[in-house]
């Protein structure tokens, strides 16, 4: 199973140390819960229609929820696109003027990247409804569905051959899965398959990223973008546009300069268009001609090349406080900033103020609806991560320091306790290691937190009154994100002691260690429900749902939210999208509606 590439961004770096399953018995919860979480998904994206060079762009069906990955029908009269306007990602169709709007798929699973067949009768798309991202075909007249690829790994970006007999797609089924601390890199190759699922053929063998395929009009070549693994970090390296002969496998590199180049398409014969990214990015054409500048994502052109559609982010206000779609009605979701924590009365919320990849984080306090925001704590030299309210609501604990090893100064951080006005800050640790991610005991007398340092890894419990420290776990394994049960009897945490990261629980006296998850890939960010009956966590078990290079940079684009009972049973999926969802916490029971 795939695991995300954790590069230099917040949800990755907080997991790193400085250098050196239950049964699926389902029952309906007696209570209705609310989980707050952070996501690297765009706040909102809209689709735009423009001239073939990207000029004269105008919004198409602007909506407060995500619309993206649009493409034209073969006759150019309609547009199919993905939207989350009704919760989960589904595929819609509308005329060029936006009417009539028709929902083509309706499933709690992730449906995306839809393209209509050359005869206009079928829709190929990516769906997770079988448990991973596969290529599916929907017969538009009858609604009949079939899974074309049906493989345990991820298949993405379908493209119809001009005769409608074949589909080209990218897949990470042969990914190299190089280990990089918390996760692995996703690599993809280009494949062909007949529409009945037969004749599977691997086209590229680059052991890197080959994706976004598109057919030539004579069916002899496939166009795609290509990049080395080293180009997929937060500072993206160069990528190129390549054409491959399907008969001889001869590659022709169509570009050779620096910068990012993605999503190539043949338009109006042999002309090749693509998009570039960066401060001067926009629409490009092989040969040097430039189109409109600006952020252009997932472009598609009409058959004659006179029009194009694309999406871009249209809202950047941060942090958000808004409802999120949940696959389980008993567990409502609220998207917030990183590391949300509610006061015991539920009348105030603290979060970190920055998005991913920022070295300095302050703590914001606000009302639960996001209003009345103010900076509770900030420091010019140190970052404050993972604030958490005390059970009595009179104090807030947080990690404070330089968490990002190898970037700016030594990677040391401490555990701080402050009053709810951000004053009276008291440091509990000695500054000799990377301490972080505190969690209160139910009586408010102790804190459990992560210790990481040279030859020092584990979990530590501190007496808040005296500052006395007690080792809970220690060893070469990386134990992280402890969460103290409201019942007081167990502490949940993430550990790689048995290979990849899984969720464990342990008694506060260090006895009775139990492993709760046993899934290929990493499980992390565990948090107890207010009644101690459930644990929410992030897992990559659902795999990638798109090429990671085509999503806004985040190191784990396949992290979804899941819940399970306190003993690891009754595991349920809450989110199902192509973005990283993480750092969950719970709204107090008294604030549930």
What are these regions (language model features)?
Residues 7-17:
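Bacterial N-terminal signal peptides
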Residues 23-52, 56-58, 62-72, 333-345, ...:
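Beta-strand-rich domains and repeat architectures in extracellular enzymes and scaffolds
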Residues 29-31, 74-75, 118-119, 162-163, ...:
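Residue-level detector of Asp-centered blade-edge/turn motifs that repeat once per structural unit
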Residues 35, 79, 123, 167, ...:
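Hydrophobic beta-strand positions that form the internal "hydrophobic ladder"
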Residues 51-55, 95-99, 139-143, 194-198, ...:
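Short loop/turn segments that connect beta-strands within beta-propeller blades
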Residues 57-58, 101-102, 146, 201, ...:
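A structural motif specific to WD40 beta-propellers
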